[in-house]
UniProtKB/Swiss-Prot annotation:
GO CC terms of this entry: plasma membrane; proton-transporting ATP synthase complex
Name the UniProt record assigns to this protein: ATP synthase subunit beta
Catalytic activity: ATP + H2O + 4 H(+)(in) = ADP + phosphate + 5 H(+)(out)
PANTHER family in the cross-refs: ATP SYNTHASE, ATP SYNTHASE SUBUNIT BETA, MITOCHONDRIAL
Known EC number: 7.1.2.2
Keyword DNA repair applies: no
Similarity comment text for this entry: Belongs to the ATPase alpha/beta chains family.
Localization terms from the record: Cell membrane
Keywords of the record: ATP synthesis, ATP-binding, Cell membrane, CF(1), Hydrogen ion transport, Ion transport, Membrane, Nucleotide-binding, Translocase, Transport
Coiled-coil boundaries: none
Subunit structure: F-type ATPases have 2 components, CF(1) - the catalytic core - and CF(0) - the membrane proton channel. CF(1) has five subunits: alpha(3), beta(3), gamma(1), delta(1), epsilon(1). CF(0) has three main subunits: a(1), b(2) and c(9-12). The alpha and beta chains form an alternating ring which encloses part of the gamma chain. CF(1) is attached to CF(0) by a central stalk formed by the gamma and epsilon chains, while a peripheral stalk is formed by the delta and b chains.
GO molecular function, one term: ATP binding
Length: 473
């Protein structure tokens, strides 16, 4: 253990000088532990990460927690390795910070638990899985129109209060129940209150036992917010590589990862690039995203909530993220206001997996027909608003008639929302989803009322609901 001294403190950036020409490697973790000697001092237990070498024996580091109370001359110890965090089954049902320390007021992690470094190379080219496999979510609108790929990266767009969190919870629930899969949730630079609410909601809905949670929220210094995504990813990699699992990794919010990187870059004195972002923006994003993939052992499928600053999709932060995505799920406030949940926009959501050679010819054709019908309905809405339905041709009336049924049938009840809705949730296999929409498009259920299609699972439930409404089927 080589020792050094703090020689400069600039907010979250700390310079450390070592003895005898020792120079810790880049990304090494350094520890400062100081006991308060009087009431003017505070106890300090701080981890620093080496970012730059300044000469033969001096390093510039980024603090992973507040530097309050730090003074020049304090002793620093080089741990000789990067930050490492606990991995494996001990992480399930627990909440951690960026350093892998539990913050849920439960027992400490056993000392003998395995710990892995958060900085690791991406899987080698020959280790990657070559076949494209669809991840069935049981959520109709996702499986039909913007299917997720195992080992893929999905962007989740949506404003406040349109159902991002509930959709994330339902995905965690369905993967745990139907696939026995594990989920890792990384809260990056978001509100602590939301993280707390999510933890309690997951506890209530019973999915917490299959989930590890890591938080570096918006009150933390930029170093913690920048590294917490890597902490979550390291935990997910263990389940993929050592247990052969298909893991879900949720990152909320990936924009905050870039934002923290930008703050760190400025503090380190790097020249900013476009819009004031760090010059290493694409590299940092690539290092994170390339580790999220399918290998011959298992897969990490990542769902990343993306905040778009000022709704400007050309901003370098979201634009860099887009280049890595395989699918997008867009949540639309208008649909939420109509009571259609999940409020996924069927026309704006996309996936590169929606191709006949991946999902099959029938699925592809049904999805395209659904999109065409909804698109035509969208075009006709202005005419309907001005002139009314009576002015439409018979053909267009039929399009509107079916489109409204399709729109309602894209909604369904969620398991994790049972305590609010009082209705049991539904998991719909892809085959059933495709069959249901094909039959609606073919006019098999034109005689059933629109309301029978709202918030149901399989197409058989529509028929039962219509019977309960007193309609002859």
């Amino acid at each position: 253990m080589t020792r050094g001294r703090v020689i400069q403190v600039m907010g979250p950036v700390v310079d450390v000088k070592f003895e005898n020409g020792h120079l810790p490697a880049i990304y090494n973790a350094l520890k400062i532990q100081h006991q308060a000697r009087n009431e003017n001092e505070v106890d300090i237990d701080l981890t620093l990460e080496v970012a730059l070498h300044l000469g033969d024996d001096t390093v510039r580091t980024i603090a992973m927690a507040s530097t309050d109370g730090l003074i020049r001359g304090m002793e620093v110890v080089d741990t000789g390795a990067p930050i490492s965090v606990p991995v494996g089954d001990v992480t399930l049902g627990r909440v951690f910070n960026v350093l892998g320390e539990p913050i849920d007021l439960q027992d400490d992690i056993p000392a003998e638990a395995r710990r892995d470094p958060i900085h690791r190379p991406a899987p080698k080219f020959e280790e990657l899985a070559t076949e494209v496999e669809i991840l069935e979510t049981g959520i109709k609108v996702v499986d039909l129109l913007a299917p997720y790929i195992k080992g893929g990266k999905i962007g989740l767009f949506g404003g406040a209060g349109v159902g991002k969190t509930v959709l994330i919870q339902e995905l965690i629930h369905n993967i745990a129940q139907e696939h026995g899969g594990i989920s890792v949730f990384a809260g990056v630079g978001e509100r602590t209150r939301e993280g707390n609410d999510l933890y309690h909601e997951m506890k209530d809905s019973g999915v917490i036992s299959k989930t590890a949670m890591v938080f570096g929220q918006m009150n933390e210094p930029p170093g913690a917010r920048m590294r917490v995504a890597l902490t979550g990813l390291t935990m997910a990699e263990y389940f993929r590589d050592e247990q052969g699992q298909d893991v879900l990794l949720f990152i909320d919010n990936i924009f905050r990862f870039t934002q923290a990187g930008s703050e760190v870059s400025a503090l380190l004195g790097r020249m900013p690039s476009a819009v004031g972002y760090q010059p290493t923006l694409a590299t940092e994003m690539g290092q994170l995203q390339e580790r999220i993939t399918s290998t011959s052992k298992g897969s990490i499928t990542s769902i990343q909530a993306i905040y778009v600053p000022a709704d400007d999709y050309t901003d370098p932060a979201p634009a860099t993220t887009f280049s890595h995505l395989d699918a997008t799920t867009n949540l639309e406030r208008k649909l939420a206001e109509m009571g259609i949940y999940p409020a996924v926009d069927p026309l704006a959501s996309t996936s590169r997996a929606l191709a006949p050679e991946i999902v099959g010819e029938e699925h592809y054709q049904v999805a395209r027909r659904v999109q065409q019908t909804l698109q035509r309905y969208k075009e006709l809405q202005d005419i309907i608003a001005i002139l009314g339905m009576d002015e439409l041709s018979d053909e267009d009336k039929l399009v509107v008639h079916r489109a409204r049924r399709i729109q309602f049938f894209l909604s369904q009840n969620f398991h994790v929302a049972e305590q609010f809705t009082g209705q049991p949730g539904s998991y719909v296999p892809v085959k059933e989803t495709v069959r249901g929409f094909k039959e609606i498009l073919d006019g098999k259920y034109d005689h059933l009322p629109e309301d029978a299609f709202r918030l149901v699972g399989r197409i058989e439930e529509v028929v039962e609901k219509a019977k309960a409404m007193g309609v002859e089927v």
